[in-house]
A protein has these predicted regions:
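RNA pseudouridine synthases
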Residues: 1-100, 109-114, 124-127, 131, ...
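Residue-level signal for inorganic ion chemistry
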Residues: 52, 78, 120, 150, ...
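Loop/turn elements at beta-strand to alpha-helix junctions within RNA-recognition modules
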Residues: 57, 143-144
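Short beta-strand segments enriched for Tyr within beta-sheet-rich domains
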Residues: 63, 146-154
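A generic structural signal for short beta-strands and their flanking turns/coil linkers
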Residues: 72-76, 86, 90, 116-118, ...
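Pseudouridine synthases involved in rRNA/tRNA modification
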Residues: 110-111, 128-133, 143, 153-236
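Short histidine-centered loop motifs in beta-beta connectors
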Residues: 138-141
């Protein structure tokens, strides 16, 4: 489901959220005449997980500011190709190719490039003895938030996200599709933690929200026997 419509016939997350708010009584049809709730944090197409929706003018403004100022801590979970032994923070420069709807990651800045930082921590591994089949499950902290950042950044260091049609390896993607019915990149927006907040968002101050892993992710974990060696970033 897209956060916003790409085509008139699409059903968007915005519409889903509005429908939920109407059914729950948190919003009326009359309210929609002056304001329509909207998603504050967008995910890449076919990335699962948490999105935040502002259901009032003030709430949307404050939420959008928190995400814009990068004071909301955002954590993702992913399964990547290869073995990653230790966590680290990687940096680079992202350049968009609008014609191809892809990005490139460079070591040095060029005109129109955007600096990016991505922090990852290994959570578990799987290996069948063939190094070409190794998998690592990672926790990702998105320090900067650019379109395709996590997927392209990890691919640029030789650890593509499993199932990724843009930045992944086709032969391995075919394997995950055949064995586990994976039809997308295995990237999940797992957790967000809010900073100290005031005003209309005071009730969110310091709170953490988690989204359960989707079925395709769990099928790969179970089928490949990925062994978890530590917990995700602890909830407050």
């Amino acid at each position: 489901m897209l956060t916003q419509k790409a085509h008139d016939e699409d059903f968007s997350l915005n519409e889903y959220a509005i429908g939920y708010l109407l059914r729950s009584g948190a919003l009326s049809e009359e309210d929609l005449l002056s304001f329509r709730p909207s998603v504050c944090n967008r995910l890449d197409r076919n990335t699962s997980g948490i999105v935040a929706v502002g259901k009032s003018v003030a709430g949307l403004q404050e939420l959008s500011k928190l995400f814009h100022d990068r004071t909301v801590h955002k954590f993702y979970r992913t399964i990547v190709l290869g073995h990653i032994e230790k966590g680290r923070t990687i940096e680079g420069y992202l350049v968009k190719d609008r014609d191809e709807n892809r990005v490139r990651i460079l070591k040095e800045p060029v005109p129109e490039s955007q600096q990016i930082r991505t922090r990852y921590t290994p959570l578990g591994w799987a290996s069948d003895g063939n190094p070409g089949h190794d998998l690592t499950m990672l926790e990702i902290e998105l320090i900067t938030g650019r379109s395709h950042q996590i997927r392209a950044h990890l691919s640029s260091i030789g650890h593509a996200v499993a199932g990724d049609p843009k930045y992944g390896i086709r032969k391995r993607n075919d394997y995950f599709r055949r064995e586990y019915q994976v039809r997308r990149q295995l990237l999940h927006a797992d957790q967000i933690t809010f900073p100290a907040a005031e005003g209309c968002l005071e009730h969110l101050s310091g709170r953490t929200f988690r989204a359960p892993l989707p079925d395709d992710f769990r099928r790969v974990m179970e089928g490949e026997k990925i062994r978890e060696i530590c917990e995700m970033h602890p909830s407050d």
